[in-house]
């Protein structure tokens, strides 16, 4: 499993994390409980959705 860099503390309370890949690493962008919204944002920024477990 790849580590997401600079994850905000509040994100631990959300089910989906949106991250953007930069130089081969994932960087935190935001967090949502709504999968559709997380997917929408990921598409907008060229990122990906990771389930926060």
Where are these regions (language model features)?
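Short N-terminal "domain-start" leader segments
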Residues: 1-21, 39-40, 44-53
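Local beta-strand/beta-hairpin segments that build beta-sheet-rich folds
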Residues: 27-29, 50
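Glycine-centered tight beta-turn/hairpin loop motif at sheet-sheet or coil-to-beta transitions
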Residues: 23-25
